[in-house]
Regions:
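Alpha/beta catalytic barrel-like cores
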Residues: 1-121, 131-134, 139-144, 153, ...
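Conserved, mostly hydrophobic/aromatic
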Residues: 126
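Short, electropositive alpha-helical surface patch
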Residues: 135-148, 180-191
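Acidic/histidine-rich catalytic cores of soluble enzymes
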Residues: 174-203
Length: 203
């Protein structure tokens, strides 16, 4: 059994009040932007995306390296869902799927997984509340599969998902009106890697 933590490394009391990361720990924590900012600054948007993706993957590797110094029972960390901004958003999905970007992401994330395996740090993701695989809405189910597979892409680039529960888990709530049967019906729509990585949390 392991005890982990969620997304942010806060190591100083000055950071606890508003979960605000100080300069010392910034290199271990991710950055983000908003879809509104990207829409309103089209001339700078792509460069912002490059800067954030590079920072966030590097921060994840540094975070895992830091967690790897903890006692074995505490070597577990949940990585944030906002690693790649707007990965499934209509205005950005085609941009993210360009081959040169996908190739860059694979090269960027591979060292993250290598670090986790070398230091025996278990990784997890937890897609947000709008990822509802058992929703009664076909559109929401479709969007939820896209969102889940986004997390699978990150795990795949890190070298996970090749076998069942091989060092990374992606957790979702059952939620949704279709309940457990909805999850069962969704499984065939997921990639083989996704089925190896999924874990279910009962609401």
């Amino acid at each position: 059994m392991r005890i982990g933590f969620c997304c942010k490394w806060l190591n100083d009391r000055s950071e606890f009040g508003g979960m605000k990361v100080n300069a010392k720990d910034r290199e271990l924590n991710g950055r983000s932007t908003t879809m509104r900012w990207l829409r309103e600054h089209p001339e700078d948007a792509e460069q912002r995306q490059w800067d954030i993706m590079n920072h966030n993957a590097t921060a994840a590797r540094r975070l895992i390296e830091r967690v790897g110094t903890l006692p074995p029972e505490r070597r577990m960390v949940r990585l944030g869902s906002e690693m790649l901004q707007g990965y499934t958003e209509a205005g950005w999905i085609n941009w993210w799927q360009q081959k040169h970007i996908q190739d860059h992401l694979e090269n960027l994330f591979a060292p993250v997984g290598e670090m986790a395996r070398r230091l025996n740090v278990k990784i997890s993701f937890h897609p947000g509340q709008f990822c509802v695989l058992s929703s009664e809405s076909a559109n929401i189910r479709h969007r939820s599969v896209e969102e889940f597979e986004y997390h699978v892409d990150m795990a795949r680039w890190m070298g996970f998902g090749k076998s069942f529960q091989d060092g990374c888990k992606i957790n979702v709530h059952i939620s949704g009106r279709l309940g457990p049967q909805g999850i069962i019906d969704a499984l065939p729509k997921l990639s083989p890697e996704a089925r190896n990585l999924i874990t279910i949390e009962n609401d």
